From Swiss-Prot:
NCBIfam families: gid_trmFO, PRK05335.1. PANTHER family: GLUCOSE INHIBITED DIVISION PROTEIN A, METHYLENETETRAHYDROFOLATE--TRNA-(URACIL-5-)-METHYLTRANSFERASE TRMFO. GO terms for cellular component: cytosol. The lineage of its organism: Bacteria, Bacillati, Bacillota, Bacilli, Bacillales. The keyword Amino-acid biosynthesis does not apply. GO terms for biological process: tRNA methylation; tRNA wobble uridine modification. Gene3D superfamilies: FAD/NAD(P)-binding domain (3.50.50.60). The gene is trmFO. This is Methylenetetrahydrofolate--tRNA-(uracil-5-)-methyltransferase TrmFO. Its EC number is 2.1.1.74.
Length: 436
């Protein structure tokens, strides 16, 4: 018989949620949190689930994917959502919280739970037994070394360098063409051709665009590999024309001529509903990203489902390493949760902890572990991070581009109606799992 205790490493959003899901099912939890014994550069308190950036958990309405995700989590008795609803402050259509009340609620619930033993110490290695690793983007160097030994050198990353991801339905297919450079292999990229005049306008706007200021502990990330395309642009037009926007081998089949510049879009999920901009990792402010991207032919009305980011982040190559149950492929008793798995955002991190906690509990009970349907946001997130292209894997937030298309839906359906149908389908589906 399996042991009746689970070790949860990290009391952030994911670890706190995982610990709650285990404890409420009668399972003993050893919850390890190194703060305040060892602080991170971003944390300021010893409370669990401290929100280190914004106090907003984003949109609350069901016309947004993250709003649907929240409702699914409420259905499954999420501690994080219980805390957020209790500590909410006025924020229009968003769910924002008093961050101290929010973290205090979670800390009190876990510290006072009879099935939770809190250890304020740093774990430097992955222990034996059933373990959930939820140490977040600022995982300590010693534990990072242990993770690297487990995952392998090439499967642990220390920063995000992600290009924006677009909703494929909002790309103007009349202005782009499908082609791979020099026609090698199958035609795998959508290409957005630019004239010299279009490129000049794009370039001038790009070099004027505002960037997000880097935090002190993030200053080194540009030197580790991927350079933001706005930094390339500062080196001159030709840096882009010989870099991510080079047109060689990409003649436009409509004209037979080579464009002056080309922006390539790579399919980002197996369903072909999402596309990322190749080589466009960026640190521009989000409003600027939208403005600049919409200067590209074919993308004038493109919806960005995930903005480009560059920031400090410890995460694993989940497509290579994880099952959709959040278990490691090579060790069934080891689970991962939170931003470390490649989910992006407060709510998404907590959601992964919720499923990891439920599945660790099912393992102890000798029950079949749960993989939620892709029609749910919880299921679609788990599916994405474990089936995405491992060679180009970058963290992802909740969006409707991850869920299966609607059956029998008219092609010209309005976006809001489509989203409403996605939401209704997700919430009907999650009801079947409310007694997990």
């Amino acid at each position: 018989m399996l042991q009746q205790r689970v070790t949860v490493i990290g009391a952030g959003l994911a670890g706190s949620e995982a610990a709650w899901q285990l404890a409420k099912r009668g399972i003993q939890v050893d919850l390890y949190e190194m703060r305040p014994v060892r602080q991170t550069p971003a944390h300021h308190t010893d409370q669990f689930a401290e929100l280190v950036c914004s106090n907003s958990l984003r949109a609350n309405g069901l016309q947004n994917a993250v709003g649907v995700l929240k409702e699914e989590m409420r259905t499954l008795d999420s501690l994080i959502l219980k805390a957020a609803d209790t500590a909410s402050v006025p924020a229009g259509g968003a769910l924002a919280v008093d961050r101290h009340e929010f973290a205090g609620f979670i800390t009190e619930k876990l510290k006072n739970h009879e099935n939770v033993t809190v250890h304020n110490e740093e774990l430097k290695e992955i222990p034996e037994g059933i373990v959930i690793v939820a140490t977040g983007p600022l995982t300590s160097p010693d534990l990072s070394a242990s993770l690297k030994a487990f995952t392998g050198e090439d499967y642990l990353y220390f920063y995000d360098a992600a290009a924006p991801i677009l909703d494929g339905d909002t790309i103007d297919r009349d202005k782009v063409y499908l082609k791979s450079r020099y026609d090698k292999g199958e035609a795998a990229y959508l290409n957005c051709p630019m004239t010299e005049e279009e490129f000049d306008v794009f370039y001038e706007e790009l070099i004027k665009a505002e960037v997000v200021p880097l935090k002190e502990f993030e200053k080194e990330i540009y030197f580790e590999g991927c350079m933001p395309f706005e930094v390339m642009a500062e080196r001159g037009k030709k840096t882009l024309l010989f870099g991510p926007m080079k047109p060689v081998g990409l003649e436009d089949p409509k004209t037979g001529k080579r464009p002056y510049a080309v922006v390539q879009l790579r399919q980002d999920n197996s369903a072909g509903t999402l596309y990322n901009l190749v080589g466009f990792q960026t640190h521009l402010k989000w409003g600027e990203q939208k403005r600049i991207i919409r200067l590209i032919p074919g993308l004038e009305n493109a919806d960005i489902v995930r903005y480009g980011v560059m920031h400090r982040n410890t995460f694993i190559n989940s497509p290579s390493l994880l099952k959709p149950t959040y278990q490691a492929r090579t060790r069934d008793t080891l689970f991962f949760a939170g931003q470390m798995t490649g989910v992006e955002g407060y709510v998404e991190s907590a959601a992964s902890g919720l499923l990891a906690g439920i599945n660790a509990a099912k393992m102890i009970a000798g029950e079949e572990l749960v993989v939620l349907p892709r029609e749910t946001m919880l299921g679609s997130m788990a599916h994405y991070i474990t089936t995405a292209d491992g060679k180009h894997f970058q963290p992802m937030n909740a969006n409707f581009g991850l869920v299966p298309s609607l059956e029998d839906a008219p092609k010209k359906m309005k976006k809001q109606e489509r989203y409403e149908r996605y939401a209704n389908r997700a919430l009907e589906t999650i009801q079947q799992y409310k007694d997990l």
